[in-house]
Amino acid sequence: MAVVAEPQQPDLREPAGWRRSSNRIATWLMVLAFVLVIIPLGFVLFTVISKGASIISWQFLTGSPIPPNVLPAGIGGMWPAILGTIEITALATVMAVPLGVLGAIYLNEYGGKNWLAALIGFMSDVMTGVPSIVMGLFIFSIWVLHFGFSGLAGAFALGCLMLPVVIRSSDEMLKLVPDSLREGSYALGATKARVTATVVLPAAIGGIVSGALLAVARAAGETAPLLFTILTVTTANPNVFSGANTAIPSQIFANATSRILRPPV
């Protein structure tokens, strides 16, 4: 007859001092790690606010920037860059977000393991790792050389950078929707398209929106693609589809590399 060993129970009579001490040590280590992560961000925010708060004014927000290499009579403004950023980012969002969500729906609900789903997944992974400057050069070679600089070219570049982020984040959110919701809808006779539109998407909409906002935030801060696509001018261009344009990241780069702003050697 085999003897089954009983599982050993912890001796609760032993002093709990070591357990409490180890818990405190772990807690303080996590707090320290959190502080070490926050310190650089706090330093950046403090520097930006302390050095830039005195410059922010209505004139700065509504005025035009001073052309590079021109002796300034004032600090200039950022209105053309603000308008350009809104236009280009909005157009890139309109291009990338619907296409990315539709791609994620196909991957998760329709594609399964067929060749098209595998191709979409592979290309989204590859595009995620493409440097932004390479994407800018790509749009420059296939669009700008033929049609000229424009906000539309910048939107194409930013949209290509946003697309894989939207696809992957939306795909992960759709995977989190319980299969029981789908099965219950199918049991009621709903079609796959109706289940996707009325059950799956509403259940995952919060995560999809969060992923889209992350993609928008990334696109709005990109500089390299815009240097090759919009030209960066000092006047506002409300027509995002034609003519050179500007944006906040590219305008900051132009200001930083302007000779008039360089310290004497």
What is each model feature region?
Residues 39, 85, 89, 93-105, ...:
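Hydrophobic positions within alpha-helical transmembrane segments of bacterial inner-membrane proteins
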Residues 68-72, 226-265:
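Interhelical loop and adjacent transmembrane-helix boundary motif
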